[in-house]
Amino acid sequence: VPEKSNLPMIYVRSKPKDHGQGRQIEGVLKPGQKTVLIDDLISTGGSVLKAVKAAQKEQAEVIGVVGIFSYQLTAATKNFAAAKIPFATLTNYRELIEVAQQSDYIDADDLQLLQAWRKDPQNWQ
């Protein structure tokens, strides 16, 4: 994305390195720099919101998060709202199971199981 848009790129680790300079963020991040973080998968938003905090600690202005896929969990919506960070994804769980059903990868029983998981993944059995 940065190469195609001719914008700078940083890489945010889940925690600072325990060797070398001990950086959590690689790349040039200037104070006040508008920043959008990109993540592959958003479930609760926890990991990418830690990256947001790391960038904010370096005085970046995080204007949003973009993900490739979201499970659309209520926890993610609440966590992003609490952090006051907007987020969007290219696709999501609802669209995935819709396409899977239309393509005959899943049947009606599978659909019910997938929808039940989506309603309460922590307690699903």
Regions found by a protein language model. Name each.
Residues V1-T35, T44-K50:
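Short, glycine/charge-rich flexible loops or terminal/linker lids adjacent to PRPP-binding catalytic cores
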